[in-house]
C-alpha cells in the first residue's frame, strides 16, 4: 500500500474520509467549517482515520520526504488562503498556466524534466494545487514519473472539488481527443477547502455548478431540487454543504466501480457531446470552458432522454431540467460561449463523438436519464437522433 511519508499530527475536530481503491489508500481531508461535521463515510481501514490539520502537517512538522508543488500560475498574483502560505514558502514550486492547452505531452515533459532537475525520487511527494486541468496534468505526471510518486491533490475550483480531483482519473489530450492518454491512479490525499472558492471568478463557479448539477441529475433528486432554487453566484450559498453532497455522490459510485466498467459511466452524462464541443473549440482556437461544454452536452442529452421516455411526466421533468440548465448557462455567462456552442453543426461534432474513449466498436454510447436521479449507461445514440435532439434543444 502506498502512503505519503509525512508524519500525521493529530488534532481535534478535523475528520478525514478514507477512500480505498486497488491497494492504494486515499484520504479526503476536510478543513474547518461545516465540512468538519462530515460523518466518517467509510469504515474500511479504521486504523488510518486520523484527525489533523493538513496545512499544519506540512508547515509545523519535520517532513520525512521531500515535497514539491505544482500550482496554477494564477496564484502567482491571486491571494492564497493563509493556511497554505508557509507551504509555498518552504517548497520548490512549478507554475502551470491552467486550461485545456496545459493538458499536453509537451507540458507533461516539462514537469518530468523539472522533477528530474530537482532530483525528485519515487519516495517524494508531489502536491498539486489548482483546478481540474492542473490536477489532471499533475496527477498524470505523478502517476508516470519513476512509475509513480505519492501525490496530494488540493483542488481550488468548485469543479475540482466536486468532480475532477475525486475518483483517480487523470489524463492529457492527444490528437484533439480529450483525455486520450491517462491513468487510473488514486492520490494519497485529497484536501477540500472551500475557502479557495473566494478566489474564483464568476465563470469558474458556473463551471463547477455544471458538474455539481450533473451529479444531482444522475444520482440525487433532492439535491437537484435544492440547486433549482439557487444560482451559482448567490452570496449566501452554503458551499460546504453543496460540496459535501456533490462529492459524496461521486464517491459512492466510484467505490463500487473504480475502473469505470459499469455504473461509474453515468458520471459521463453530458460529456460525450461536451468533449466533442471542446475538441471543435480547440481546433478553431475558440475559448470554451469544460463545465460550460458539459452543460450544453447535458441539455442535449436531456432532450434525447425525454424523446426516449415512455412516461409523460418523465418527459416533462427531463425537459424542465434541460430548461433549467439553459437558464443558468444563459444568465450566468456572457453570450459568446452560448452563441458559439449552439451555432455548431451537429454533423461536425459527430466525428469527435465517434472517437470518444467510452465507445465500443462503431457505436456512440451515451447516458440516458430515465428520470431525475436515475440513469442508464451504454445507450446507443444514432447520428440522426443526435441531429434531431440538437435541433430541438436550441
What are these regions (language model features)?
Residues 1-9, 13-14, 23-40:
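Short, positively charged low-complexity motifs
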Residues 40-125:
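ATP/NTP phosphate-donor binding region
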Residues 210-212, 312-394:
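C-terminal charged capping/lid subdomain of soluble metabolic enzymes
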Residues 226-347:
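Active-site segments that bind and position negatively charged phosphate/pyrophosphate groups
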Residues 98-99, 129-131, 269-270:
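Glycine-rich beta-strand-to-loop/alpha-helix junction loops that act as flexible
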Residues 140-232:
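A glycine/threonine-rich phosphate-anchoring loop and its flanking beta-alpha core
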Residues 133-140, 276:
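Short glycine/serine/threonine-rich phosphate/pyrophosphate-binding segments
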Amino acid at each position: 500500500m502506498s502512503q505519503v511519508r509525512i508524519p500525521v499530527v493529530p488534532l481535534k475536530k478535523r475528520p478525514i474520509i478514507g477512500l480505498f481503491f486497488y491497494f492504494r489508500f486515499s484520504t479526503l481531508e476536510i478543513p474547518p467549517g461545516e465540512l468538519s461535521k462530515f460523518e466518517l463515510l467509510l469504515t474500511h481501514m479504521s486504523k488510518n482515520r486520523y484527525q489533523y490539520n493538513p496545512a499544519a502537517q506540512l508547515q509545523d512538522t519535520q517532513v520525512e520526504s521531500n515535497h514539491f508543488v505544482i500550482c496554477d500560475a494564477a496564484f502567482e498574483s491571486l491571494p492564497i488562503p493563509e493556511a497554505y502560505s508557509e507551504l509555498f514558502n518552504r517548497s520548490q514550486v512549478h507554475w502551470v498556466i491552467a486550461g485545456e492547452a496545459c493538458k499536453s505531452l509537451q507540458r507533461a515533459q516539462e514537469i518530468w524534466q523539472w522533477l528530474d532537475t530537482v532530483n525528485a525520487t519515487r519516495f517524494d511527494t508531489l502536491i498539486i494545487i489548482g483546478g481540474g486541468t492542473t490536477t489532471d496534468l499533475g496527477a498524470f505526471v505523478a502517476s508516470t514519473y519513476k512509475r509513480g510518486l505519492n501525490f496530494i491533490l488540493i483542488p481550488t475550483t468548485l469543479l475540482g472539488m466536486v468532480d475532477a480531483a475525486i475518483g483517480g482519473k487523470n489524463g492529457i489530450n492527444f490528437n484533439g481527443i480529450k483525455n486520450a492518454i491517462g491513468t487510473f491512479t488514486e492520490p494519497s490525499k485529497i484536501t477540500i477547502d472551500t475557502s479557495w472558492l473566494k478566489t474564483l471568478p464568476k465563470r469558474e463557479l458556473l463551471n463547477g455548478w455544471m458538474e455539481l448539477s450533473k451529479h444531482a441529475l444522475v444520482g440525487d433528486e433532492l439535491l437537484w431540487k435544492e440547486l433549482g432554487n439557487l444560482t451559482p453566484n448567490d452570496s449566501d450559498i452554503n458551499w460546504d454543504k453543496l460540496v459535501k453532497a456533490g462529492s459524496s455522490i461521486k464517491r459512492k459510485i466510484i467505490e463500487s466501480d473504480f475502473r469505470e466498467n459499469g455504473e461509474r459511466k453515468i458520471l459521463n452524462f453530458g460529456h460525450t457531446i461536451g468533449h466533442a464541443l471542446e475538441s471543435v473549440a480547440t481546433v478553431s482556437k475558440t475559448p470554451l470552458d469544460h463545465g460550460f461544454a458539459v452543460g450544453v452536452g447535458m441539455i442535449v442529452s436531456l432532450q434525447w432522454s425525454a424523446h426516449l421516455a415512455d412516461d409523460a411526466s418523465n418527459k416533462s421533468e427531463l425537459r424542465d431540467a434541460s430548461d433549467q440548465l439553459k437558464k443558468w448557462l444563459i444568465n450566468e455567462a456572457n453570450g459568446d460561449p452560448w452563441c458559439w456552442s449552439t451555432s455548431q453543426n451537429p454533423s461536425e461534432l459527430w466525428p469527435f463523438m465517434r472517437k470518444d474513449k467510452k465507445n465500443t466498436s462503431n457505436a456512440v454510447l451515451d447516458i440516458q436519464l430515465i428520470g431525475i436521479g436515475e440513469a442508464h449507461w451504454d445507450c446507443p445514440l444514432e447520428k440522426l437522433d443526435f441531429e434531431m435532439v440538437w435541433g430541438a434543444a436550441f
